Amino acid sequence: MRGLWVTAVALVFVVASALAQRDGGSQTQPVPLTFGETFTLQSEILSEVRRINVYAPPPYAQSPDTRLPVLYMPDGGMAEDFLHIAGLIQVSVGNGTMRPFLLVGIENTERRRDLTGPTQSADDKKIAPRVGGSAAFRRFIRSELMPIVNTRYRTTPETAIMGESLAGLFVVETLFVEPDLFDTYIAFDPSLWWNNKELLEKAGSRSGASGKQQRTLYLASSDEKDLSLLTQQLADRLRKNAPADLRLHYEPMPQETHATIYHPAALQALRRLFKPGR
């Protein structure tokens, strides 16, 4: 791919606390703690530079023969959801409640452009200067990002994608329009109101067999009334109309708000879907 340039640097997210010495309490110079790495790539499809953040849990470094499945996440910037999801993976792998995964966070440039499909709704078009770019974003993931990740890191063919709100909408849309792209789809409070509830209305007809042996969709919803109702309706329609090769989980979480659901829902999803030995 022309125009590719990659710069790998350590992700520095906290400065180590100074340590008191025994001889009078003097302090050492602080040193950075590193957590994963970051690189950028020039996307020809999106005509812009994109930053990618990557976390590999300890088993990856312990053996040069270790290969890991990959969990992709939109909203994957350092100031977005990357760090807290990476922390969940670190803890869950460490305490043996999930299999190790390589986490690949895609940092946003124009979130509402990338994560939404075309819309006929005038209200939808008011949320950002540009919307409806999900097909191009999907091509970027498939044709530019995935090949680079598979070249730079030791990966297995297994893939998953996780997102919340508009990113959850993108996850569900991708399952419907390109189900072979990932093995596991995880969506929290997906914005199914987009384009007059198009994905919900077409849930039965657009969830045909993918050709893979099995796919998984994990849904969770908060106490947000409209979002939880739409997510429940999607789960109900898929249970009725989805093919046999789609494994569906739906977890209502009324104790959470739209602002708080991501972290606890991700913890439950990772533990349930990626148990060791599964």
Predicted regions and their residues:
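Positively charged n-region of N-terminal signal peptides that target proteins for export
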Residues: 1-4
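Bacterial N-terminal signal peptides
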Residues: 7-16
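Non-catalytic cap/lid and distal C-terminal segments of serine-dependent acyl enzymes
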Residues: 21-278
